[in-house]
Amino acid sequence: MTNLEKIYYVNAGPGGTFQKSGDYYTTPADVDNLFKHLEDHDIERLLVYFHGGLVNEASGMEAAEVMRTNFVDAPSKTHAVTFVWETGLWEIIVENLSAKSSDNQFQKVLNYVIKIVGKKLGVGARGGGVTLDNPTIEAEKLKVYPFAQLNNQLGNSRSGSVMFDEDDEEGFLARLEQESNTMIRAEDEMATEEIEVAEPDPDAGDSRGLLLTLGKLVAKIAFAVLKRYAQETHHDFYPTIVEETFRKIYIDRVGKWGWSEMKEKAQKMFDDNQGRSGDDLHAGTYFLSLLEKHYQKRQNAGKKFAIELVGHSAGSIAICNMLAATSENFKQLKYNNVVFLAPACRTDLFIAKGIPAKQNGVYKKFKMFTMKEENEKKDYCVKYLYTYSLLYLVSGLFEDETDAKIMGLHEQFKAKKRYENFAELKTINSFIMSNKLALSDDITNTDNSMWTDSFRHGDFDNNPATLKSILSTINIV
């Protein structure tokens, strides 16, 4: 166990409250002591950090230790506090994804979908709409970046080049099912074999899925993939097929449920505390109430006090809610920098809560560190299975709609090519480009507050170049 003093972290438990849920916990009295420490040591700068939302408690505490080590500095009167708000679901999600993917039925379905989709997109082993054979598929799946050459052939396929009948979707699906059945029988498989799928509402309380025949299931998944290509909402060939296969075969419940629970906790941390007391208080709101009092006291005394907000991955969601709560209920508070590291918040959330906060003077400056598109597509979540980054997985599987717009995805916020006609992406692009954007890898910029060379989504909050950049950023007032 980490022996980190409680002045360096605030642990948000179930429902975003102070209720204990693990080995580490925070009480309202601990937060009182934190602000007493700030006053007693005449702290002039406070960095508030939010780690990603799917990590476990131990990882959250490790992040708090990294922040303490890198940003707490007595000579400059700088203190750092980390919100440890773990859900611990990432290991569960990866374990379930990996377990399901090793299932023979899953692999069988995946291979048939690859064959049908590849043929419909007009490519094959050598291009020209040839059906990919089993040895080619299996060889590709053993690569770190499966079907990379095929992706290069497809590029950002325009809808006109995709074989998809938007005028008769029902008929197109029926024809796909016929084609699936024919292909399956040709390989001496049973097209009528039944497979459990995730058709029922995950919130309905019925853990059993529907049973679909192999042929019908393959057709439904191929239909979903081809529709995403036609509507230009795909995440390239193999990741899209994997996403849609998981959406149909049961396992996406784990990811969507975990992600939804995490977002709910990020919201509840800053819910109203009226009528609550003790450990039932919402940790974020209680923290803000004391932060506002401390900020006003420093202001009235003519003393310096700058507040810096830094959020990694889903920590950006918590910060969006913190900014909204500040705007509505703690209007005397003003922040200096808001720094996002590979943010996993939806663009519409930031447009609704983050942009207005800056326009209204709640914070002065914004900076985002994230990966270039080509690096994002080399950061595999699950090796040999989901070969793009966590942000793509969130966009393609964890949100309700496919290709949900996520703020840290370079391919999306560039608002170019197939993303050029999305109004929300134009809005987010305009905001990002009018502020500061650091893309990995960049360690040659003349401005050393823009350096980053993180090539993994999870590394931004412990990447030396990025940490030094944040330090340079918050020291520029």
Kindly label every feature range from the protein language model:
Residues 1-26, 87-163, 189, 195-306, ...:
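Lipolytic serine-hydrolase domain surface
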Residues 22-38:
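A short loop-to-beta-strand scaffold at the N-terminal edge of the catalytic core in hydrolase folds
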Residues 37-45:
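Proline/glycine-enriched tight loop/beta-turn segments at coil->beta junctions
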Residues 44-53:
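Short beta-strand element of the alpha/beta-hydrolase
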Residues 54-60:
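Short substrate-entry loop that stabilizes the transition state in hydrolases
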Residues 62-78:
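Short amphipathic alpha-helix adjacent to the substrate-entry channel of hydrolases
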Residues 75-89:
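Conserved alpha/beta-hydrolase
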